[in-house]
């Protein structure tokens, strides 16, 4: 079920504004249209609303690699068949192969992200015998029950309308005894950039549409795994500050990583103008620190009783 009230950190005025807007979205039905929500996210990561996403790897790999390395360091991937849900440009998938995975399925809702992942895999010498690319919906995985030894999703959960369903799908496709590793956006994840963007953008075009980003607490993520039937669940939270030379650089990073999907309802001719205004706001307010808040959760699928 889609979430209505903002679950992360924001300044009080912005939290009140977002919650009021999301109530309106619920009343009009927009907040319950999960298909449209996922479509906006997919289009954002395919560059439909802005070309910022073309800088995804150049501007974001250094920061995203830190979370990916931390997520995989607890996993034994040697000889395992692995599914990477919401693989983006393949950062986790390629790390999994380096850690000895037998084969990785790199799955994402965006064909543009998959294109970049394919190119990176080819450049690193990984063929189709080791890595396969699939367009997938995290809430309805196109795989049979008990298909993988390990299922990983890195920092995708917060973009999904039905997070519980996504975790249930992860558990379903795991083999008995298999490991799940879920990376989730914590409450403070990118909050400075979110807050500044909400203040700066033209509100008339986003009025009545649910925001497509939903951070979670460590306790909430743990509960999602437990409710999906996973056992031996453990979590840890990592936070750090990403520093940028100036506010413009901070905005460029945020717009690329988040894909600027909030421009979905803007007239196309208004997007560049509003993006420039928002970037100027970041510079004027000296937004040069952006928090990474990462919840890492692990669980095991129980073995069949016999």
Which positions does each model-derived feature cover?
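A short glycine-rich, Lys/Arg-flanked "PGG" loop and its adjoining helix->strand segment in the class I
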Residues: 164-176
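Residues lining the SAM
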Residues: 107, 154-157, 183
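A short SAM/SAH-binding and catalytic strip from SAM-dependent methyltransferases
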Residues: 150-162
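Conserved class I S-adenosyl-L-methionine
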Residues: 5-77, 91-95, 125, 181-203
């Amino acid at each position: 079920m889609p979430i209505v009230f903002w679950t992360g950190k924001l300044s009080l005025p912005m939290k009140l504004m977002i919650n009021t807007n999301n109530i309106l979205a619920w009343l009009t039905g927009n907040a319950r249209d999960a298909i449209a929500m996922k479509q906006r996210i997919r289009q954002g990561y395919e560059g439909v609303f802005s070309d910022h996403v073309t800088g995804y790897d150049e501007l974001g790999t250094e920061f995203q690699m830190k979370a990916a390395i931390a997520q995989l360091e607890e996993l034994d991937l040697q000889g395992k068949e692995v599914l990477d849900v919401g693989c983006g440009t393949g950062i986790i998938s390629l790390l999994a192969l380096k850690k000895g995975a037998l084969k990785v399925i790199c799955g994402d809702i965006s064909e543009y992200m998959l294109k970049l992942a394919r190119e990176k895999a080819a450049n690193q010498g990984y063929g189709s015998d080791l890595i396969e690319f699939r367009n997938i919906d995290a809430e309805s995985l196109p795989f049979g029950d008990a298909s993988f030894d390990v299922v990983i999703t890195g920092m995708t959960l917060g973009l999904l309308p039905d997070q519980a369903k996504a975790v249930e799908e992860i558990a379903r496709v795991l083999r008995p005894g298999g490991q799940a590793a879920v990376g989730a956006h914590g409450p403070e994840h990118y909050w400075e950039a979110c807050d500044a963007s909400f203040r700066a953008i033209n509100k008339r075009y986003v009025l009545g549409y649910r925001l497509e980003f939903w951070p979670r607490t460590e306790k909430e993520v743990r509960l999602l795994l437990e409710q999906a039937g996973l056992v031996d669940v453990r979590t840890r939270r990592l936070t750090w500050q990403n520093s940028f030379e100036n506010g413009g650089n901070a905005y460029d990073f945020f717009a690329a990583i988040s894909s600027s999907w909030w421009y979905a309802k803007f007239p196309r001719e208004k997007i560049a103008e509003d993006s420039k205004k928002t970037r100027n706001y970041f510079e004027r307010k000296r937004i040069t620190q952006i928090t990474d808040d990462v919840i890492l959760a692990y669980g095991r699928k129980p073995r069949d009783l016999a």
